[in-house]
Every structure is written in C-alpha cells, then in structure tokens.
Design a protein with these regions (language model features):
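Hydrophobic face of amphipathic alpha-helices that form TPR/SEL1-like repeat modules
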Residues: 42-50, 81-88, 114-121, 151-159, ...
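Terminal, low-structured helical/coil segments at or just beyond the last alpha-helical repeat
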Residues: 176-196
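Sec-dependent N-terminal signal peptides
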Residues: 4-13
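Canonical positions in the second alpha-helix
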Residues: 31, 69-70, 101-102, 139-140, ...
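Structural signature of tandem alpha-helical TPR/SEL1-like repeats
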Residues: 20-26, 54-66, 88-101, 125-136, ...
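N-terminal leader/linker segments that initiate helical-solenoid repeat arrays
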Residues: 16-51
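Short helix-capping/linker turns of helical repeat alpha-solenoids
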Residues: 34-37, 49-51, 73-76, 105-108, ...
Length: 196
C-alpha cells in the first residue's frame, strides 16, 4: 500500500517543503500544541515522510494524530493528510468521504488531486472511476494545482476508458499546467506543438 501512496504523498509534501527545511520537529510540535492548525498539518507530513522511509507503525500513528488535530481545526491540508492515513488503515470509504468533503467544502487542491489519483486506477481500495477521477483532477486544476491539469492533459492525450483522445483538450490542460509552473505540462506543450 505504501508504494501507491508514495506518489500522492510526495505531491502533498511539496506544499510543505519550505517549512520542513526551515523548522525542526520540536518547533513544529510546539506550534501545533499551541493551536496552529497549519503547523499540525506540517508535523503530520513530517511524520508521514518518516513513516514512508521507515515503515514504523508508531510514527504513522503520530502522523495520523497530527493530521487529525489539524483537520479538527479546519485545516484542509490536515484533512487531506488524514484522508491518506485512513487508506493506510484500510478504510477507503472513510478516506473517500473525507477527501470529497475536503475538496468540495474546504477547496483543498491536494485533496481533489488525491481523489483523482485514487479513482483513476482504483488505487488504495477505491473503485475505479475514470470520469470521477477527471472531475476531481479538474477541481484540482481549477484550484491552481498544476499536477491536476497535467493528469487531465495526459488522459486526453492518450484516451482513457471511455474518454477519447483529444489533442486540443490535452494541449489546453498542459498549457494551463505550464502556466501554473508545471514542468511536465510545459514539456508536453513543446512535444505537442513540435509535432504540428
């Protein structure tokens, strides 16, 4: 299960890379304990990265607890992280419910993206649902998350399930990804335009 989650976690982690480099764990713990929901989410992410590297179940539980504290305080990134934690616990239904709420109500792009990721191929115990995945990738893209745009570009570029390949649609999403700073989107634009 950890291998499936690794890609989602790395995208989730990118949102916090600066904080993780500039603050130590003790500082994050103190800030979380003082009520800073965003720092609780960063703390959860730091623990989750350690869990991915070590496989230590106690560290995973610390991660889930920090994410839950952040989520309980209304932090969307904390809720997105808690949704990933539910998958580790084997509860895809709870994960899907929380990620949907976090995406739809809190407008958290990482939650939208993760829903797309899990639905596209049925990762993490989710039911495969290409149209559902596209819906959530679209929401992530609309919220300014370049990877969501890239995924839509990829789906339209090659076609997926009952979605026909459409180079114009692919180009539209790749260009949006590129405008949002997505290197893969920029590379895809060059490939498509170079082929014309």
């Amino acid at each position: 299960m950890k291998k499936f989650l690794f890609a989602a976690v790395m995208l989730f982690s990118a949102a916090f890379a600066t904080d993780l480099q500039s603050e130590n764990l003790a500082s994050l713990k103190a800030q979380c304990q003082s009520g800073d929901a965003a720092k609780c989410a960063v703390l959860g992410d730091a623990y989750y990265e350690e869990y991915i590297a070590s496989g230590d179940e106690e560290v995973r539980k610390l991660s889930a607890a920090a994410f839950k504290e952040a989520c309980d305080k209304g932090d969307g990134e904390g809720c997105a992280g808690l949704g990933l934690s539910y998958i580790d616990e084997g509860d895809a239904a709870a994960s899907e419910k929380l990620l949907e709420k976090t995406c739809d109500e809190l407008k958290t792009a990482t939650a939208c993206y993760n829903l797309g990721f899990f639905k596209i191929d049925g990762h993490g115990g989710f039911r495969q649902d290409v149209k559902g995945a596209m819906k959530y990738y679209e929401k992530a893209c609309d919220l300014g998350y370049a990877a969501g745009c890239e995924e839509l570009g990829g789906i339209y570029n090659v076609g997926e399930a009952d979605v026909k390949a459409d180079e114009n649609q692919a180009l539209k999403y790749y260009e949006k990804s590129c405008a949002l700073g997505g290197k893969d989107g920029c590379d895809a634009v060059k490939l498509i335009k170079g082929g014309k």
